[in-house]
Amino acid sequence: MNEELLNEIPLLEDKAVFEIESASSLQDLEKVRLSYLGRKGVIKAYFDDLRKVEDTEKKRDLGAIINVLRNKLDQLIMNKESILKAEEVNFKLQNEAIDITLPVRPEKIGRAHPLSKVMNEVKLIFAHMGFRAVNGPDIEDEFHVFDALNTPSHHPAREEQDTFYLKNKINDKRMMLRTHTSSMQIRAMKKAKTFPIKIVAAGRVYRNDFDATHTPMFHQMEGLYVNENVNMGQLKFTIHHFLNKFFGDKELKIRFRNSFFPFTEPSAEVDISYKESKWIEVLGCGIVHPNVFQNVGIDHTKYSGFAFGIGIERLAMLKYQISDLRNFYDNKISWLSHYGFHFSSLR
């Protein structure tokens, strides 16, 4: 083995150096490394054969020669690896570079829902008029939704086909999803210690109806003003001011029609001139019924008040020419992109 090994090593070294220098990728270089320095490589085989040499001095000399070869190949492979990695980085920099002169891809930014826009507009208008916003629960009892509002037990609104009742009672009270936000007005009047009361109550309401102009859930804002000597003239001024501000038309034609609501007397429905050819209802209002004051512990001989209820969806449909109420809840991105608003518009 001694003579054979001494003759093979120079040839093996030349062959290994050539293969290392010829490697064009890190994968090729790894194959060369394994063939020479791996567990089953040539150098490992030389060391295995070295065990068979009995002469200690020769074994030491041959081992030194093999070690020199191993270290040389290891160093060459490390140098080549550094070169290949640098070339790989340069290739990526040249071929995957970002051209900073190119325009950026447009970022998809969400849009504010038209109902959010209208709700904010309405709240802001009434805030400037001195109305304070209040909140209340979506699940209410019959007293706050019907009884306190002078709605008799035989009224159609109390039937199950119109109202979503819950199966379980709380404190022997029948519970339901509120059909209007007037229930928040009742709560505000019951808590009131000082006057005037000047509030708007906005939120979701629920009725068992679904078509192009009705949905089982929709949004409503109701206003209430209670003080001494409140009259219909003050109510009309408030409604006129609100509608003119909301639609941005000081010449907007508005009319009040006699109507009936169990919680107001007198009552009126308010219409605006639509497309100069017909009138369309936008809200209901009236002077608070004395029975309502009596139900919440307010002296109706001293105090009076007015109330109004506004459908947020109805206002949005009129202002932005939306024909189908159900579109508000379809969650279609294309529709929201068309009818939505930039968030900066939500003042």
UniProtKB/Swiss-Prot annotation:
A cellular-component GO term for this protein: cytoplasm
Localization: Cytoplasm
Any single biological process term in GO: phenylalanyl-tRNA aminoacylation
Catalytic activity annotation: tRNA(Phe) + L-phenylalanine + ATP = L-phenylalanyl-tRNA(Phe) + AMP + diphosphate + H(+)
Keywords: Aminoacyl-tRNA synthetase, ATP-binding, Cytoplasm, Ligase, Magnesium, Metal-binding, Nucleotide-binding, Protein biosynthesis
Enzyme Commission (EC) number: 6.1.1.20
List of residues binding Mg(2+): 265
Free-text remark on how the cofactor is bound: Binds 2 magnesium ions per tetramer.
Disulfide bonds: none
A Pfam family matched in the record: Phe_tRNA-synt_N
Assembly notes: Tetramer of two alpha and two beta subunits.
Protein name per its UniProtKB record: Phenylalanine--tRNA ligase alpha subunit
